[in-house]
Amino acid sequence: MSAIGSTPIDAEAKNAPTSGRLFFLDLSGGRILSANPDGSDLKTIINEGRKLPDGLVLDVAAGHIYWTNMGDPKKNDGSIMRSDLNGKNMITIVPPGGTFTPKQLQLECN
């Protein structure tokens, strides 16, 4: 009888930077929040410049958060935004109307 086994792998890239925090969306409140993994130290990171945020990705090495705004599903007013990890220096990557109800994001690292 043969045995079937598995070898665990490290899903994180070696030496990849980390903020050590969870970042998540409050869709109904239109906010981006952050907390420690145990739920403590809850902070509002973004509370403006969003309309139904729906996708979120971090680039910790560059110090950025990227997110999508769905906008009104009946209108062509979706957008993609970026800010620093602390919510400062918010800019528009794709302006409202540049995409229709964008959803998830993926950041491709070099």
Question: Which residues fall in each region the model found?
Answer:
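Surface loop/turn motifs at the tips and blade-to-blade linkers of beta-strand repeat domains
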Residues: 45-49, 93-98
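Residue-level detector of Asp-centered blade-edge/turn motifs that repeat once per structural unit
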Residues: 16-18, 59-62, 107-110
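A short loop-to-beta-strand structural motif that recurs across blades of beta-propeller domains
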Residues: 31-33, 78-81
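Hydrophobic core register within WD40 beta-propeller blades
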Residues: 4, 56-58, 103-107
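An edge-strand/N-cap motif at the start of beta-rich repeat modules
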Residues: 12-43
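Conserved positions at the start
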Residues: 19, 53, 101-104
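Residue position within the beta-strands of beta-propeller blades
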Residues: 24, 66-68
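Short glycine/acidic-enriched loop and turn motifs that connect beta-strands
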Residues: 29-30, 71-75
